[in-house]
């Protein structure tokens, strides 16, 4: 029971799941990424890692792809929800597949952005708890913060909300893959991975 019960909406809909998922990921992804570099720094193995015949970008991308793959694998079992909702629909198969597919694409981009943020924060401290807390804060701010700011500046609310992840995730969840939304998430991901590389280069020098 409850507002996030996907079987309790009265129609074939996965909105409760896709509404809850960003909240779960805000805590799950930082928990996965917090040790990416903070543990290396704490154990004194980061210097050794940076001397390997790999570019810093390759090292960062390896950590990023590892985290991304792990979280995506955790999301795959939720496809069962799609099958269940589709089969329970009246008539059977009465589900908005466009919206569902768009929402999953939105989740993928959201996971990538959160992962990049989490990996970046893991370079800020050798304490993984600190890395976790900072990552949670940044993910929360980028997803909910701009919506909150927009609510108190109604004259430019649309402009302010466009800086937040929630606005773009909701857009993709409508089943429309707008290049602006894809570019937004890609930019956030690349920017935070670039910050990670910069921090590691500073540490190396």
Model regions and ranges:
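Hydrophobic/aromatic residues in alpha-helical transmembrane segments
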Residues: 29-33, 81, 117, 165, ...
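Hydrophobic alpha-helical transmembrane segments
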Residues: 16-17, 46-57, 77-83, 124-139, ...
